[in-house]
Amino acid sequence: MAQISTTSEHTIQTLERIGAHSHVKGLGLDDQLEPRPSSQGMVGQRAARKAAGLIVKMVQDGRIAGRAILMVGPPSTGKTAIAMGMAQTLGSDVPFTMLSASEVFSLEMSKTEALMQAFRRSIGVRIREEAEVVEGEVVEIQIDRSLTGATKTGKLTIKTTDMETIYELGNKMIDSLQKEKVTAGDVIAIDKASGRITKLGRSFTRARDYDAMGSDTKFVQCPEGELQRRKDVVHTVSLHEIDVINSRTQGFLALFSGDTGEIKPELRDQINIKVGEWREEGKAEIVPGVLFIDEVHMLDIECFSFLNRALESELAPLVIMASNRGICRIRGTRFRSPHGIPIDLLDRVLIISTKPYELADLKQILTIRAAEEEVSLKPEALEVLTRMASETSLRYAINLITTANLAAKRRKADEVEVADVRRVYNLFVDEKRSVQYLKEHAEQFMNESDEYGDIDGLNSGAPIIGRQASAGAVQA
């Protein structure tokens, strides 16, 4: 008797990455740009959100390019979250580039070149062109294969409400149809110049072909009139992409590899002239985007002098900078300045300040983060985490949500309790307890000499994190 073999079923774990700001979906403003108490993942910071909403409105109207905004506030007050909310509100049509100030320091290219490339990435060019397209509903697709299977030929029957035509298909078009999974009843558009096929949706006449449809299935009317028609097509590319494509040393392949290297300023000048001609002819329009530079105090004096000039150029995006420093040394100099930024650049920026969160706001943020990470918290555990967030930092409390959930799963519980939070609180120390431990065991650590930073400041109660001592450490 033949044996019946059974195979075990394995579930494939999908990769899910929950970022620090993945819960932010916008700025949470109403139509009058008034901030809602809790909306789109944003809580508190009403004045800062309203100011950011005003900036977004001016960007959408194209009236604030070439300006600079500085967001300042203590750590864990939502500066980066507001920038992410601005990016979500602006949408995919407006170029938004996020950059950390330490990213500009590279051995492959100069600091000013890295900043210039970030500037050019943040400026879009909307190019309009007229294309011939074939648009209609697919009636039938016939594909014939040769005996060897090397060649494929076929016929495509496509119709509108007024006419119907049969097209002969070659290998490339058959592959494109199979890639887009085009079947009878789909409404498609074929670009005659490039052969690109776009699936517009499914015809209403085929709505009852299947009992069940996917949520992404879109039903459209069968097109009317001629099959072949002229259509305005809009492409949005950044100035940096045009620079790379026209760079002889790399060419367009550098767009995929990312190894663009330095681009000559003469080439950029020629592209600016050409884009200016397209604007005058009505073929293109400039879309000023947003460049967000986080931890801007990490830039040095050469970068700041470059920003002074770049902000006043004709093609400049809106530059948003964020810093959590107070009065500290400007990198590359011996001078001290507010937020580590030179006075002449501070004179050019609009400053938005963020304030520490209140207890109710912290509780709401932790609730949103727990829902985002699919963690069920008991009310008592949420209260303990809120108190921890106010006494230590918001980031520390958010990190404890995931670890406390793991501790709850170890004891096969569905909800995180206070005992789980206390367990991980004892396992992972926060910044204040770490400093206290360092004070108690200072002699056992390898310390730097007084020339760079006096460890005795620990014993005298001098502030360490995010204050004066950190500015000295950055300069060292």
Swiss-Prot record:
Lineage: Eukaryota, Fungi, Dikarya, Basidiomycota, Ustilaginomycotina
GO BP, sorted A to Z: box C/D snoRNP assembly; chromatin remodeling; DNA repair; regulation of transcription by RNA polymerase II; rRNA processing
Keyword rRNA processing recorded: yes
Function of the molecule: DNA helicase which participates in several chromatin remodeling complexes, including the SWR1 and the INO80 complexes. The SWR1 complex mediates the ATP-dependent exchange of histone H2A for the H2A variant HZT1 leading to transcriptional regulation of selected genes by chromatin remodeling. The INO80 complex remodels chromatin by shifting nucleosomes and is involved in DNA repair. Also involved in pre-rRNA processing.
Binding site residues for ATP: V72, G73, P74, P75, S76, T77, G78, K79, T80
EC numbers, comma separated: 3.6.4.12
GO molecular function: 3'-5' DNA helicase activity; 5'-3' DNA helicase activity; ATP binding; ATP hydrolysis activity; DNA helicase activity
Keywords: Activator, ATP-binding, Chromatin regulator, DNA damage, DNA repair, Helicase, Hydrolase, Nucleotide-binding, Nucleus, rRNA processing, Transcription, Transcription regulation
Any single GO CC term annotated in Swiss-Prot or TrEMBL for this entry: Ino80 complex
Pfam families in the cross-refs: TIP49 (PF06068), TIP49_C (PF17856)
Record text on subunit structure and interactions: May form heterododecamers with RVB1. Component of the SWR1 chromatin remodeling complex, the INO80 chromatin remodeling complex, and of the R2TP complex.
Naturally occurring in which organism (per UniProt): Mycosarcoma maydis (Corn smut fungus)
Record's keyword annotation contains Nucleus: yes
Subcellular location: Nucleus
Stored SMART domains: AAA
Stated name of the protein: RuvB-like helicase 2
Catalytic activity annotation: ATP + H2O = ADP + phosphate + H(+)
